Amino acid sequence: MAGNRNNDMNVYCSFCGKSQDEVKKIIAGNGVFICNECVALSQEIIKEELAEEVLADLAEVPKPKELLEILNQYVVGQDRAKRALAVAVYNHYKRVSYTESSDDDVDLQKSNILMIGPTGSGKTFLAQTLAKSLNVPFAIADATSLTEAGYVGEDVENILLKLIQAADYNVERAERGIIYVDEIDKIAKKGENVSITRDVSGEGVQQALLKIIEGTVASVPPQGGRKHPNQEMIQINTKNILFIVGGAFDGIEDLVKQRLGEKVIGFGQTSRKIDDNASYMQEIISEDIQKFGLIPEFIGRLPVVAALELLTAEDLVRILTEPRNALVKQYQTLLSYDGVELEFDQDALLAIADKAIERKTGARGLRSIIEETMLDIMFEIPSQEDVTKVRITKAAVEGTDKPVLETA
């Protein structure tokens, strides 16, 4: 309510003491008055304090080098991809912090991330590790389970519900989280020509994902499933959610070779080395991704492309032993609870890596191979109190002999 100007009583600002004749406007409250100049000054003070809070928030976000150091503790290899992710994630949260406090004319757009790499190269684990290091909610979705609205399957909004659930239904916290969408290459258009039939899980899903990736206020059913009339919805703004999408994109290196003018190797010809194909993955540009089947609008919302390389046997052995949560360390800890020491021969580790490569499962297949090798041991050991040490040999991994047991 504005203070009334009258001839009988002059109104003064309770903060600066100026009269209503000295300012443009005085607003009256419960026994107090404030002028337009003090309102403007208050806004400026609040803005400065918010900016200081933002700088404090940003100080808590690890710098790119610090993020890389964290990733190096858990993820073996993929140095180029880790650098790209560290920079992209830091810039994203820097953008979020400044956008929330600044009214600058410059609109800082979101830089979502596309990770391209073979199965088991560490795409999902990289995204998980980043979210954990930043202490933000994290959700994983499988693109192949998604359909556009009106078809049997999972609506894209259900991805947001997973993030809200990960944030314990704290929507404000969820709005600064990370979503990883896997198998994104599986919803690529099957060829560049538009199909006459309806594309339920291809271009339509890309269009649906596009809306939430670029930033929108989405209505999410609190219990998941399809939307129904008169159903109470959770409103969530996706403009500050970081989307990381990943896929194997099998065969995309051939598109890169074609673009670069090189002949694609056919049947019966000598194949290029894996290292050569790995270097082609670093040459991927948006044109190649579009030819693979992602629509231009969708690609445009994924400006950061991180290409992951096929893991070698040496990489897999390092994954087994070096990270803080390495599988060998985990199984050694498990057996230590039974008072038993666990040791892997070097050639046994290499045999595990070779099996994973043979099965084309990469790092994600390592645990199942160890489980197969150690099943009988883990069954028997708790009942054999005289066993003090178990040694896993190459023969044990290959199934031609049993692990070596040492007794007291």
UniProtKB/Swiss-Prot annotation:
Record-annotated disulphide pairs: none
Residues that bind ATP: 118-125
Cited InterPro entries: AAA+_ATPase, ATP-dep_Clp_protease_ClpX, ATPase_AAA_core, Clp_ATPase_C, Clp_protease_ATP-bd_su_ClpX, ClpX_bact, P-loop_NTPase, Znf_CppX_C4
Top-level taxon: Bacteria
A Gene Ontology biological process term: cell division
Gene Ontology cellular component terms for the protein in this record: HslUV protease complex
Keyword Chaperone: yes
The ClpX-type ZB domain, residue ranges: 1-54
Coiled coil: none
Record-listed Zn(2+) binding positions: 13, 16, 35, 38
Record keywords: ATP-binding, Chaperone, Metal-binding, Nucleotide-binding, Zinc
GO molecular function (one): ATP binding
This protein's record includes keyword Magnesium: no
PANTHER family membership: ATP-DEPENDENT CLP PROTEASE ATP-BINDING SUBUNIT CLPX-LIKE, MITOCHONDRIAL (PTHR48102:SF7), ATP-DEPENDENT CLP PROTEASE ATP-BINDING SUBUNIT CLPX-LIKE, MITOCHONDRIAL-RELATED (PTHR48102)
Function in brief: ATP-dependent specificity component of the Clp protease. It directs the protease to specific substrates. Can perform chaperone functions in the absence of ClpP.
Family: Belongs to the ClpX chaperone family.
Subunit: Component of the ClpX-ClpP complex. Forms a hexameric ring that, in the presence of ATP, binds to fourteen ClpP subunits assembled into a disk-like structure with a central cavity, resembling the structure of eukaryotic proteasomes.
Protein name: ATP-dependent Clp protease ATP-binding subunit ClpX
Organism of derivation: Streptococcus agalactiae serotype V (strain ATCC BAA-611 / 2603 V/R)
Lineage: Bacteria, Bacillati, Bacillota, Bacilli, Lactobacillales
